[in-house]
Amino acid sequence: LDYQDAVVVSDTSFTLYNDSAKELAQRQHSFSSPVLRTDGSLAVVYHQEGTGIRIESASETLTSRNLEQKIISASVSSSGVYAALTQSKNYLGELTVYLSDDTEKYKYYFSEWYPVDISLSADGTWGAVTGIAAQDGTVKSVVYIFDFNQEEPKAKFEFSDNLLLSIRCLESGNVAAIGNRGASIMIPAAQEKIDYDYQGKTLSTFQLDPYYGMVLALAQSEDGRNCTVVRIDNQGKTAMEYPVARKVTSIGYNNGVAGILSSGRIYTYSDLGEETGAYDAGNDAKKILLYSNSQAYVLGVSEIRQVFFS
C-alpha cells in the first residue's frame, strides 16, 4: 500500500484505490463483521468475534486462514509479522504472534486482565496490548509492552478509572494510548508514562499516528460543541492546545496542519491555533484523513472523496 492509497473494507470485499480514485484491487471475503487495520504497506482484515484473518498487500492476499479461537483484535507490521488477540479455553485471552510465513513466533496467556486491543511496531519485533478488569465497581485498564524475544512482558502500565479505547506503537519506540478520561504516552525504556488528563472534558474524536503521536478533540459538554484541540507528540510533550468554537466530528493531523470536520466542512489550523482555511467536505461526510498537509480523504455515506487545501 502506498501512503496515498485509500483502503476500504465492506461486508463483502477489500478494495484499494490510488490517489486519483482509480480502483487498483478488489478482493472478496466472507466475513460478516470485518475489521480493517493498516500499517505501512500491509493491511489486516479479520472477522470480529469470528476466526478468519487475512493479510493484504497492494498486489495480493498474503495470508488467508482461520485461527483456532475467536478473534478479539489483530495487528500487522510493515515487515509482515502479524498478531492476534483471541479468546481462550482456559485463560482470559491469548496473544499469538506469527511470522510472515504463518509460523508461530510468540505466545502469551492472559490470566488477570481481559485483552482488548493490540498494536505492533513497524518492524514486528515488539508490541503493546491493552486489557481491562473491574475492581471495586470501577473499570481499570492496563497496557502490556512485549518484546517477542522475551517470555514475559518487559513493561506493564496500569490505569485507574480510565477505559482505554485505542493504542498505537510509535516510531519513537514509545506507545500512545487514548482513554475516555485521559491519554498517555508510555516510554518503555524508562518504565514511565506521561499522562494528559481531560479535566472533565468529553473526548469527541481522535487520531493516533506513529510519527506525530496523537491529536484529540475535547468538548466542553456532551453535545460536542466548543472543543479544545490538543496534539501530544510521540515523546509525550503537549505540542499544541487551542480552542475551537465548533462541534468536531472527525480530526486529523499531518506535518503542521490540523484538520477538523464540522457540519460538512473541513477547517484547517496551524500549530499555533490559527484557522488557515475552510473547505467543503459534503453534507454526508463522516470522517476525514489527512494524507498530507494539503490533501485529505473524506469518507461519505457511499463514497470516498478528496479535498485539496489551497
Per-region residue spans from a language model:
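Acidic, serine/threonine- and glycine-rich low-complexity intrinsically disordered segments
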Residues: 108-230
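Intrinsically disordered, low-complexity segments enriched in Gly and acidic/Ser/Thr residues
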Residues: 190-281
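Residue-level marker for isolated small/hydroxyl-bearing positions within beta-strands
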Residues: 9, 46, 84-86, 129-130, ...
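Hydrophobic beta-strand positions that form the internal "hydrophobic ladder"
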Residues: 6, 43, 80-83, 124-127, ...
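Non-cytosolic head/periplasmic domains of membrane-anchored proteins
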Residues: 22-131, 137
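A short beta-strand motif characteristic of beta-propeller blades
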Residues: 20-28, 59-66, 103-109, 151-158, ...
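Repeated scaffold domains used in trafficking and secretory/extracellular systems
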Residues: 1, 29-41, 68-78, 112-122, ...
